[in-house]
Amino acid sequence: MITKSSGDGVHWPSLIGALHEYAVVGRRVKVLSSALSSLIPPQARVLDVGCGDGKLDRFILRQRPDASIEGIDVLVRPKAQIPVRRFDGVTIPYPDSSFDAAMFIDVLHHTPDPLAILREARRVARVILIKDHFRNGFFAESTLRLMDWVSNARHGVALPYNYFSQSQWSDAFAELRLNVREIKTTLRLYPPPASWLFDRSLHFVARLEASAPS
């Protein structure tokens, strides 16, 4: 919904957000559900960390009815489309090895310490699926900040703009002893001509697996 500012002008975050919702969100859900559903282990119990309303999970389950997905979030939405449990954003409220896989879909760059919550995910699941960004190339930082602001500012989501370069992600995975088993970098989340600016090499989906204890 487009709202008014306190004066007579249009509230621009709401207007731009509404246009983004119309042009991008539906496509994003379809593209990501397809990309992620192929990476989930067979008959997996999956935890979606920072699941939001669970709409993406519902689309994944249409393609993977053998799996089950439940979520955790710092804010539990009243009409979430999967079971959701509240958590503090730091400690995942489940015992070790409770899940076959954990997912972070555009969540880690909203956290102050991505490695800390990834370490928690590694504790509860051996397979970790990530959709996030690469801060690589000219204007990557400013482009990612713009996308984040358009998508999230009107919802009151924290925006620390904590983007990693590809080499920083590689270092983080190595530190946590997470092996990259598959990675997708051509996602086509945006229709042309927006894709020329907002797709590029800024997005990735990855499947990681924890190394066996030595």
Outline where the language-model segments fall.
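Glycine-rich helix-loop-beta junction characteristic of Rossmann-like nucleotide cofactor-binding loops
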Residues: A35-P41, I92-P93
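Class I SAM-dependent methyltransferase Rossmann-like catalytic core
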Residues: T3-S34
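A conserved beta-strand element that flanks and buttresses the S-adenosyl-L-methionine
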Residues: M103
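Core SAM-dependent methyltransferase catalytic element
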Residues: P191-S214
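A short His-aromatic
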Residues: D106-H110
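Class I SAM-dependent methyltransferase SAM/SAH-binding core
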Residues: L47, G52-T91
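C-terminal alpha-helical "lid/dimerization" subdomain adjacent to the S-adenosyl-L-methionine
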Residues: R58, H133-S195
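A short glycine-rich, Lys/Arg-flanked "PGG" loop and its adjoining helix->strand segment in the class I
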Residues: L115-I128
